[in-house]
Structure formats: structure tokens, C-alpha cells
Swiss-Prot record:
<keyword id="KW-0132">Cell division</keyword>
<feature type="transmembrane region" description="Helical">
    <location>
        <begin position="102"/>
        <end position="122"/>
    </location>
</feature>
<keyword id="KW-0808">Transferase</keyword>
<dbReference type="Pfam" id="PF10555">
    <property type="entry name" value="MraY_sig1"/>
</dbReference>
<comment type="function">
    <text>Catalyzes the initial step of the lipid cycle reactions in the biosynthesis of the cell wall peptidoglycan: transfers peptidoglycan precursor phospho-MurNAc-pentapeptide from UDP-MurNAc-pentapeptide onto the lipid carrier undecaprenyl phosphate, yielding undecaprenyl-pyrophosphoryl-MurNAc-pentapeptide, known as lipid I.</text>
</comment>
<keyword id="KW-1133">Transmembrane helix</keyword>
<dbReference type="Pfam" id="PF00953">
    <property type="entry name" value="Glycos_transf_4"/>
</dbReference>
<dbReference type="GO" id="GO:0008963">
    <property type="term" value="F:phospho-N-acetylmuramoyl-pentapeptide-transferase activity"/>
</dbReference>
<feature type="transmembrane region" description="Helical">
    <location>
        <begin position="176"/>
        <end position="196"/>
    </location>
</feature>
<keyword id="KW-0997">Cell inner membrane</keyword>
<feature type="transmembrane region" description="Helical">
    <location>
        <begin position="345"/>
        <end position="365"/>
    </location>
</feature>
<protein>
    <recommendedName>
        <fullName>Phospho-N-acetylmuramoyl-pentapeptide-transferase</fullName>
        <ecNumber>2.7.8.13</ecNumber>
    </recommendedName>
</protein>
<keyword id="KW-0131">Cell cycle</keyword>
<feature type="transmembrane region" description="Helical">
    <location>
        <begin position="207"/>
        <end position="227"/>
    </location>
</feature>
<feature type="transmembrane region" description="Helical">
    <location>
        <begin position="142"/>
        <end position="160"/>
    </location>
</feature>
<keyword id="KW-0472">Membrane</keyword>
<dbReference type="GO" id="GO:0046872">
    <property type="term" value="F:metal ion binding"/>
</dbReference>
Length: 368
């Protein structure tokens, strides 16, 4: 919305004198900063009202896993879920205000984010109303996610300003790319769905998921800005994607809304993100990575999410094949709880790992 102030200064009589001031809205960096502040302020202001309403409507709050750490049955009992509504509302408001409304990449990523958020919301609704840890059918959920992801990948190949590359770029190697052709649709959908569920699995402790999401969003804000700038993209020898820089504004909105949410999700949490938030944020990260052609880099920057997902896959596979469990409990953050680590120790150490992985992922931009 603010982006249109540039045109108004040129067309509306009397606003010409403000053109030098309004010209700052041309700059993605300025609007990204504005998106961060707006997203944070929105959640700060409306967060308490949302929490009170969710607590009133949910009653007993999110059901706690009976097979999890016994301390959770006491410390987390009665805490409302669906906190992702706070993040998504702040994200959407901030993006609408600060992003270029004519940019197709912004709308494609927003569609994935809200689509995954809607799936997560329904899952949370079933859990709260039935007071069970299981939501609706896993197969149904995966199918819906896959359909949304496939539609988004197809839209990327058709709605971009220039022909969208279907090549898979290999980090650390100069001019090395694998053209996937139509297989790009399946690969891109796998990245988006995988990211959504990986973040979902990570969201098991107070503050554990939101900070790594913010770190990843900040990292991809930088990547999107560079990929959308022809000069920087040429210098770094990464794919130039016209218009992709606008995704930095969306990443800024996520960072701001995440900061606001962390205020209420910090231990002991007043609200949980729920599938509403974790699925949406993961899907958003996946779709941005696909849009800016840094899918493999997402696996590095979001390595913590990959670790959490792999721990579950390995645990399930091991138990089915051998009848034995490799970890005391999966996802892996619960394994460390069973080893005696306190919740703050796990959360802060995982944050540190996320920062290190983000730095490693960003280093791939230059090391080619």
C-alpha cells in the first residue's frame, strides 16, 4: 500500500513537494525495515487480546502428549494453542502495507503460507475440541499440502516477469546446475511440504521453533534481495530473478511478527504457535527458497529443522524394521529432555546451532 505513494507523488497535484520524502518507499531495504517494525508492533498490541480470546474459547488448551516428559503435563497444561493466528495476522497486515502489491512472488508465497496455515488451523481445532494429540488424517493433510505446493510451483513457472528457471543450483560450485524440467514441480513441492512439516516437528518447546524461523527468514531476506538485484546477482554469480527482491519485505514481516510472538511464547509460554503457525511458517520458508532458487541452501540454513525431521524418520524406520528405538524420544529435542537437559538449555543451544547454520548457508553465496 505504501509503495503506491511513489506514484501518488507524481500524479496527485500538490504532492510533488513530498516526492523526495516519498521516494524512500522505492527502496526494498527501507520497506523491509518498516515491515519488521509493523509486524512486531501489531503482534505486541493485539497479542494479549488474541491470547485472551483463544484461552476463553479453548478452555483446556492444547492437549499434552502423555508419552512425553512428565513435567510438560504440569507446566504446559491449559496453555492455549493456535498462536500462529497472531503471527499470520501480523505478517499479512505488514506485507500488505509495505510490499509491492503487483509483485506475483509475494502473492504466491502468501498463498502457500495462508493455505498451510488453514490446514494447521483445522488440525489444531480438532485437537482442542476432541482433546487428543492427533488431528485429522495424516494422509489427507499431506495431500492438501501437496496440492497447494504443486499449484504454487506451477504458478512460479507461469506468473514470473521472466521465464522461471527450473534448474537446481548446487552450492559451492560455479555454474553447476541440474535442469529438472517438469520434475521441478515435484521437487519444489517436496521442498515446500518438507519444510512445512519439519518446522511443525520442531515446535515442541517454548520458543524453540520461532527463533530459528526468524533466523532463516532474515537469511532469506538477504538472499532474496541479492537474487532480485541484477548487479549483486552477477557479482555473486547466482540466478538473477527479477522481482524476487520483494520477498525480502515478506521476510521482514515474518521477522517482526515472530519477534512479537516470541514476547508471549518465551518460557513459560503464554501461548503455543500450534500447527496454525508452524505449518504456515515452514511452508513460507520452503516457497521462498524455491522462488529464489536456493532450495539446497534452505537445507543448510534450516538444518535444525532437517535434523528434527530426520530424527523422526529414523526413529520410525528403526522401530518398524528392528523393533528398537534409536532415540529415547523423537523429535530429537525430546531425546535431550530425556537425557536430563532442561528446556532452556535445549532451546538456547538449538538457537545457537541455528545461527551457525545460517552463517554457513550464507557463506555459500560467495564460496563458488
Amino acid at each position: 500500500m505504501f509503495y503506491w505513494l511513489i506514484d501518488l507523488s507524481n500524479t496527485v497535484p500538490g504532492l510533488g513537494i513530498f516526492k523526495p520524502l516519498l521516494n524512500v518507499f522505492r527502496y526494498i531495504t527501507f520497506r523491509t525495515g518498516g515491515a519488521v517494525v509493523t509486524g512486531a508492533l501489531f503482534v505486541f498490541l493485539f497479542g494479549p487480546w488474541i491470547i485472551d480470546n483463544l484461552r476463553l474459547r479453548q478452555g483446556k488448551g492444547q492437549p499434552i502428549r502423555a508419552d512425553g516428559p512428565q513435567s510438560h503435563l504440569v507446566s504446559k497444561k491449559g496453555t492455549p494453542t493456535m498462536g500462529g493466528l497472531m503471527i499470520l495476522s501480523g505478517l499479512v497486515v505488514s506485507t500488505v502495507l509495505w510490499a509491492n502489491p503487483l509483485n506475483p512472488y509475494v502473492w504466491i508465497v502468501l498463498a502457500v503460507t495462508l493455505g498451510f496455515g488453514l490446514i494447521g488451523f483445522y488440525d489444531d481445532y480438532l485437537k482442542v475440541t476432541k482433546q487428543t494429540h492427533a488431528g485429522f488424517s495424516g494422509r489427507t493433510r499431506l495431500l492438501l499440502e501437496l496440492l497447494i505446493a504443486l499449484a504454487a510451483c506451477y504458478a512460479l513457472t507461469r506468473l514470473g516477469r521472466e521465464p522461471f528457471s527450473t534448474a537446481l543450483v548446487i552450492p559451492f560450485f560455479k555454474d553447476v546446475a541440474l535442469d529438472l524440467g517438469w520434475f521441478f514441480l515435484g521437487f519444489g513441492a517436496f521442498i515446500i511440504v518438507g519444510a512445512g512439516n519439519a518446522v511443525n516437528l520442531t515446535d515442541g518447546l517454548d520458543g524453540l521453533a520461532i527463533v530459528p524461523v526468524m533466523i532463516a527468514a532474515a537469511s532469506f531476506a538477504m538472499i532474496a534481495y541479492l537474487a532480485g538485484n541484477a548487479v549483486f546477482a552477477d557479482y555473486l554469480q547466482i540466478n538473477y530473478i527479477a522481482g524476487a527482491g520483494e520477498l525480502a519485505v515478506l521476510c521482514g514481516a515474518v521477522l517482526g511478527a515472530g519477534l512479537g510472538f516470541l514476547w508471549f511464547n518465551a518460557p513459560p509460554a503464554s501461548i503455543f504457535m500450534g500447527d496454525t503457525g508452524s505449518l504456515a511458517l515452514g511452508g513460507m520458508l520452503g516457497s521462498i527458497a524455491v522462488a529464489v532458487k536456493h532450495e539446497i541452501v534452505l537445507a543448510v540454513i534450516g538444518g535444525l529443522f532437517v535434523l528434527e525431521a530426520v530424527s523422526v524418520i529414523v526413529q520410525v524406520a528403526s522401530f518398524k524394521l528392528t523393533g528398537k528405538r534409536i532415540f529415547k524420544m523423537a523429535p530429537i529435542h525430546h531425546h535431550f529432555e530425556q537425557l536430563g537437559w532442561t528446556e532452556p538449555q535445549i532451546v538456547i543451544r538449538f538457537w545457537i546451532i541455528s545461527v551457525m547454520l545460517a552463517l554457513a548457508g550464507l557463506s555459500t553465496l560467495k564460496l563458488r
